[in-house]
Amino acid sequence: IFTDQFTGVDRQYGTLNGYSTLSTTYESFWEDIYQRGISQIQITKAKAIEGGNTVAEGQALILEGYHFAEAALVFGDIPFSEVNNPEFSSPSYEGQRAVLTGAIAMITDGIAKAGSTSAENNVLETSSTWAQIGNSLKARYYLALGDMTNANSSAVAANFTSAANDWNITHSTANYGENLFWQFEVEQRADYLKMENSYMAQLLNSTDASYKGNAKTVETARYNYYVAANGLSLNTSTGGFAAQTASFPVISFVEVQLIIAETATSNSAKLAALNSVRAHNASKFNSTYDAYVEADFQTGGIANDGHTVADAMKMEILLEKFCSVIGLPTYQDVLRTDNFIGVPIKSSNTTMIPQRFIYPSSEEASNANFPGYVDQFVATPIHN
């Protein structure tokens, strides 16, 4: 909603669409990260160490690093090294950059211990090893830190060559096993969350002034993948983004390739990565995504709307990611680039989208080291 990939329409989602949030808004997210995520992972890690299971320890380290990093990206400073240590009943909040660096170190350690093992299990489907998953996550976090060199080298090391490498959460027709967007739209809160008038829908709609298509790009099929036939709702039909059994990637081939495209130092390398995504799109959507050449980004080119060549390529890469990667990675891109792609501001009371999530009230009530209320429009340290 904040990035305007989707639109909040009804009840509390209409309120969220105007950026009106409270500390209670984020209670469940914090609980999922810490109580249901990190605490369980740390128990697994401890048991793996006790049992001498180095591979399981490595898997736990990668997952632990992932959870801490994702929390730090949206909340800023968070409890980290003292979490679940009985010596610290109120874990201290540690700096966002330090937490991200520590999370990357955890993932690196996990790769060393579990790297060659398949990352597929009964929840996640992939052809990737844990080393590939770990390196792809490191690429995401280095990019958020603005470390383009390490973001690029980690993304290249991930060696994601096709969508088979996607780390997909699988879904089924079983009760509570369905795609979460499908559950929300079909079973729980129909049309609270829509595509209606969202920036992403406008970019993909060939009749809209913001349409990102051109002589080499036809986005109609992708628009129909996201948007229901009524032109308003999420597409929950078979084959749609929010279909009942549609999988959802934790990290994907497309995200990794677009990290390479953004961070590569040569235009040829940028184009190679971007065009690999376009070839993927052509197959996935059975539509036209012809390969770009550098001339397309020069003055007067079909992919240049008055920018320098470098900025025209950056715009195309970031818009492609915006229309391909749903959720928090794209949110970080908007923050990191100072809204380079021009996501509309949906509230008349501000000139920016929310810069962070608000610490939950449960932390204020239970942690003596709670740092105090920080407004959602205060940038986190890495984006300040």
What are these regions (language model features)?
Residues T3-D4, S20-V186, K216-N384:
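Acidic/polar-rich alpha-helix caps and helix-coil junctions
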Residues Q12, G18, Y199-M200, A228-N230:
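Terminal low-complexity, poorly structured segments
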Residues Q183-Y225:
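C-terminal amphipathic alpha-helical segment
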Residues I1-L16:
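N-terminal leader/linker segments that initiate helical-solenoid repeat arrays
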